[in-house]
């Protein structure tokens, strides 16, 4: 088994990425987290062999479109805890990527091209400023975990009904007034976290979700004596109110 070529520059107070890094085109893993980086040059596109790229905990305000040239990225891309107000459209070229974290940024939207990331299994966009998701989110047919805590999401697009592999959905601390109907047919969904929204009523179809194991409704306006909740518990679902 080939040894992965890794360059770990975590917390080196770099301020900027040394030019020498971009010449290391054999790298499989590049860790640049927590370095006070404010910009990333187009040279990032030269590292064609990268499988994992960690740019978390910096001060990046944008990411160059050349990121989309890293088509071998298959493990993880960390962009969390930066100052990103938008993501490059070229993200859609990363069809092999399995894990993407863009949490803790001031993102208000996600690019429609995200639907091209067909290999994505876990997507984290917690603590941004999202009000909804793009329709293209429904193209992520391999998605198993979706983490959206701490946004201002009022609704989910109808296309989320196509996320048939979804197991875990975190929607706590958002602005939902009803449970999104697009979840009704997701037969593999096991956990739904709806804490701290604006829910006051629940749809009957929740009791028809065959795999539902845990439903967290704390800090909403839901009446804990609703017959539906008792029914869910009899079906083996843990309900927290």
Named regions from a protein language model:
Residues 1-37:
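N-terminal segments that cap or nucleate solenoid repeat domains
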Residues 5-7, 30-32, 53-55, 73-79, ...:
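Conserved hydrophobic beta-strand positions in leucine-rich repeat
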Residues 17-20, 40-43, 63-66, 87-89, ...:
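The feature encodes a structural signal of leucine-rich repeats
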Residues 23-26, 45-50, 68-73, 92-97, ...:
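Leucine-rich repeat
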Residues 43-109, 113-116, 121-127:
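A generic tandem-repeat structural signature
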Residues 104-108, 112-191:
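Eukaryotic tandem repeat interaction scaffolds
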Residues 200-241:
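Leucine-rich solenoid repeat scaffolds
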């Amino acid at each position: 088994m080939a040894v992965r070529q890794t360059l770990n520059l975590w917390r080196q107070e770099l301020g900027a990425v040394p030019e020498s890094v971009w010449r290391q085109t054999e790298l499989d893993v590049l860790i640049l987290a927590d370095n006070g980086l404010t910009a990333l040059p187009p040279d990032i596109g030269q590292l064609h062999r990268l499988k994992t790229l960690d740019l978390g905990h910096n001060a990046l305000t944008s990411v160059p479109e050349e990121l989309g040239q890293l088509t071998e990225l298959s493990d993880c891309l960390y962009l969390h805890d930066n100052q990103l107000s938008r993501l490059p459209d070229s993200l859609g070229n990363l069809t092999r990527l399995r894990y993407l974290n863009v949490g803790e940024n001031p993102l208000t939207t996600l690019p429609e091209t995200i639907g091209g990331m067909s290999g994505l299994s876990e997507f984290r966009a917690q603590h941004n400023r999202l009000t909804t998701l793009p329709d293209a989110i429904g193209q992520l047919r391999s998605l198993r975990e979706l983490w959206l805590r701490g946004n201002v999401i009022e609704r989910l697009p109808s296309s989320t009904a196509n996320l048939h592999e979804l197991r875990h959905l975190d929607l706590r601390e958002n602005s939902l007034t009803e449970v999104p109907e697009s979840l009704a047919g997701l037969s593999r969904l096991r956990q739904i976290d709806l804490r701290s929204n604006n829910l006051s009523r629940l749809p009957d179809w929740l009791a028809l979700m065959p795999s539902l194991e845990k439903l967290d409704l704390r800090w909403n306006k839901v009446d804990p004596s609703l017959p539906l909740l008792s029914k869910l518990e009899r079906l083996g679902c843990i309900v927290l109110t």
